[in-house]
Amino acid sequence: MADGSQINFFKGHPSVRLLPRESIIKSTKELLEPEHRGYDQNPEDCHPLTYGSEQGSLWVRSAIATLINDCYRPEKATRAEHVNLTGGASYGIMNILMQTTLAHAGYTRRAFLVSPTYFLINQIFLDAGFGGRMTAVRETQDGQLDLEYLAEKLSEFDAEHPSTEALTEPRRTPPKRTYRYVMYLIPTYSNPSGSTYSLETRTRLVELARRYDMLLISDDIYDLLAYDQPSDQLPRALPSLVHVDRATLNEEQDSWGHTVANASFSKIVAPGLRCGYQESVTSRLVGQLANGGANVSGGSPAQLNSMIIGTLISTGELAHLLQSLRSVYQDRAEVLHRAVREYLPAATDYKAQNGGYFSWCTLPEGYNSEAICRTLQHDYGVVLANGSHFEVSDDELGWGRRSVRLSVSFLEPAEIEEGMRRFGAVCQEHATALGLPF
């Protein structure tokens, strides 16, 4: 190391300077300084500092629905009744699995996860009883999903366990809908690959979900961090899986749908707020998610912080935050792309990042990314996220051999440049030692 600094590309959260302290203080004061608010006694809203309703404040859900409609422009509009509030995306995934699957009982047969996958998602599925029941689904070379493989595996599992009618549990009021399969994915600016799935892929995936009674859980947490659109306007996001599902749903045959958008404000405001939301096709599924035992006991898990978020949205402050973040991350992503091309081996496989936090970098044949990452951290003070972190439990595909995930959320441009220079230097040492082309 030339100096004592550590450059950490593993971190997937904003730089401290990007955390909107002043905006949050301003919104909190606007929310709490009045002694009374018109909705304080409304059971669908409640005072910000008391227990909230199970689904979360109505006015906040209405503000989020407006934001969704402005950014996604769905064919069939999102309404407040389609949304419930959560304690963030991690809580949201846990709650979805708890409320819609029965892995322990064997009814929900299999969980499918896109691979490479978010590196902390495995434990949540293991906690929900999916140990030994998790299948990796690759992305294709063009950044889409291997839907043929997914369809083949669904057909195999259905042949092993003949299909039954969709299960609802009549003892609960309202009845609880349970799915035979579940799939986890990040369709837009995926973590870790950075891929965005086309509308055709999304449509075909919803069709498969309906055919095999599979719930699609999409982490829609990066959708609004687009770099390839003017940053002075709200981003125009691709239709989410929920919007594709809703646009073609026959409610006489299915009033639940097969999709849940699991979203968070951690990436576009601040992770410490621990606040997110979920959206489903109709009000039935989010109603089920909101009426688990914990919410019935304590109300929405982010009553105060969700109202701070609602204030940020309704005052227009969130739009300004998005504008700033997208500009900052775009600049960093451009520096990263140039540095990859300048410092890494010529045959490195890397696609320029056009949104979100992450991108995926694969070194040429013969390079060992795991060994390179160890040397980088120990001798050069650079921390990279080696591909081995992004495997699906019990269905590994070998991402640790040559691939790493890179992040622009935490490091400043000069740190990105220097980190990639050191990365390239170690790759050069590696190539020289093994007689590899550089």
Regions found by a protein language model. Give the residues of each.
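Short, solvent-exposed loop/turn segments at secondary-structure junctions
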Residues: G12-V16, S90-Y91, T117-F119, T188-N191, ...
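PLP-dependent enzyme catalytic core of the Aspartate aminotransferase-like
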Residues: L58, T66, D254-S255, H378-D379, ...
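Conserved glycine-rich beta-strand-loop-beta hairpin in the small C-terminal domain of fold type I
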Residues: Q303, G310, Q323-H337, R341, ...
